[in-house]
Amino acid sequence: ISACLVGSEMCIRDSYNYEEELMIKIAWYYYIENLTQQEIAKILGINRIKILRLLDKAKENGLITFQIRNSNAKRFHMENTFKELFHLNDILIIPSVPSSDSLNDSLAQAASMYINQRIKENSYINMGYGDTPSRILNYLAQRSESPINVISLTGGVNYYLPNTESNVFNARLHLIPCPLILSSSFIMEELKKETAIQRISKMALISDFTVVGIGGVDTNATIIKNSILTPDDYLLLKKQGAVGDILSHFIDINGNLIDTDLEKRLMSPALTDIEKYNNVVGVAGGPHKIEAIYAVLTGKYLDVLITDENTATAVLDLYQSKNNIDTERKDGALQ
């Protein structure tokens, strides 16, 4: 008996249906790729009992039938393509939504669900600077059944504080108590010598997950909207080839660091230190982030990417053009 998947066309309204997407993915591996439940558990980072429960639920809900719904199959093919091209451990592609604010919120919800499925009691999670990581933190702290420990990777405390509208915030915060960008390199170096900051830096190395946003080089970027950098700073960065940032380090299209005076005053881990962290999850989407996401992937800074379908398609198109690939796309995958 052959079995395939059917999922109703999913769109994000009040929340992203992460469990349904997970059921589809498990059913695909089990029925289409003939993997064992133990193999699927290892790939997805969840236990075998949960795999069995979700397979049963998928049958009850009618997600397992005799057809593959094109929208879900396309995303799944695209996810596999990203893993192969950019050497990712995992990727989650959600349906796209019209506005950038709705997209950021949908991505934040999806990321919080993804991480919440994989963390244990009293887990430690590193958080980068920015609007999307801040939203993820608030959703995660509300969803987590047991307290989580959140480590700030950068200065700029405001983005690590709970949203005042949250009724529940189940997280212990370990913050670097200083601005994101200091007035001088001397002050930055002296602060890094402080025992409290060194303790936080050491905690970051043993955290279970590391969550980072990916910034574009445009006037809507968090770092410029908050007047941390001026429009003139951005123009200069663009002239130097910057297409985006990760942990507030600006990089070119190939993922190389743009070395400026800003680097000497930035309270953030060195770009070369990112590979020392466990399970680095990058979360970003939207047309203004395409080059930035491509650059971060090319630089091999991520273990996991969470983005939306339109952005993922555009990043693959950019990969094709940069690598002079003249191929047809079938179901979201490069052939």
Q: Where are the language model's segments positioned?
A:
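Single conserved hydrophobic/aromatic residue that forms the stacking wall/gate
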Residues: 1-12
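Compositionally biased regions
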Residues: 3, 113, 322-324
